[in-house]
Design a protein with these regions (language model features):
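Membrane-embedded transmembrane alpha-helical bundles that form the catalytic cores
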Residues: 1-210, 214-259
Length: 260
């Protein structure tokens, strides 16, 4: 993923597209992973820390996404930026403006780069559009399987689109990636890619299957795992460790959010 973003012109359109859709997964697993480790270490020491992520990529709107993603930071911006600006207490137009401005500030909080500003603006725009249609016009997707699926797909693609600005160094790099996807994309790359990277293929399949789990199914699976014999847990741990070794790079990769 990092290699593609560093030199997109040297990779195929398929690999560029895989990087664009892979980064949202990478940053979630990276950030959520070390948040979970912090929660676990704190629990060992007798302290309780609340969850910082709650199935963010199952969100059906940008508004819901920010109730599930980096919850501690979301609450901080709500309490110290959105509410002091007036929140939703000064009319609907002001509420939309406050939502948009809060997300702009969230973008700048990550760094003084136009790419972060654009990322924040996209999320602000997504919040405003969702609130306007759902609250002002009373328009929303029906709560059916088809409606939820379409709502999820639109939200997920929009979130991935916003993440591309967060990750790319500048608009030039992002433009090159989009150009490769548009002009050098072929499914003929799929078979060689999967044959050359079997461990990555298993990871990709695992991630895709994980999207099918509901919150209830996850908690049920978690409860069953806790009751497993220690030998079974050890075997599963060894399998996971082997997969990590297979896909890991030679150099140590720092956590993405450490820079923030």
């Amino acid at each position: 993923n990092n290699w593609v973003f560093d030199a997109p012109q040297t990779f195929s359109g398929f690999e560029n597209l895989a990087a664009l859709f892979g980064y949202p997964v990478q940053i979630f697993l990276d950030f959520s992973g070390y948040s979970d480790m912090s929660i676990g270490v704190a629990a060992i020491l007798g302290f309780y820390l609340p969850d910082n992520f709650y199935f963010p990529y199952r969100s059906l709107s940008v508004t819901e996404f920010w109730h599930r993603w980096h919850i501690s930071l979301s609450f901080w911006f709500r309490d110290y930026v959105y509410i002091p600006l007036g929140g939703n207490r000064k009319g609907k137009v002001r509420m939309y403006f406050n939502n948009f401005l809060t997300m702009l500030v969230a973008g700048l909080w990550h760094g003084s780069s136009w790419m972060f500003v654009i990322w924040g603006a996209l999320h602000g725009f997504g919040l405003v559009v969702h609130k306007f249609f759902s609250r002002q016009l009373g328009i929303s997707f029906p709560r059916t399987l088809a409606g939820n699926s379409l709502s999820w797909l639109i939200t997920y693609l929009y979130i991935c689109f916003a993440w591309s600005f967060f990750r790319a160094k500048d608009l030039g790099v992002l433009g090159k990636m989009c150009d490769k996807v548009a002009n050098d994309f072929s499914i003929d790359y799929l078979v060689p890619f999967f044959h050359a990277r079997p461990a990555w293929t298993l990871c990709i399949i695992g991630v895709m299957l994980s999207y099918l789990f509901t919150e209830r199914q996850y908690h049920r699976l978690q409860a069953r795992f806790i009751l497993l014999p220690w030998v079974t847990k050890l075997l599963l741990f060894i399998i996971c460790l082997q997969m990590v070794v297979e896909v890991s790079q030679e150099s140590v990769q720092p956590f993405i959010y450490y820079q923030f």
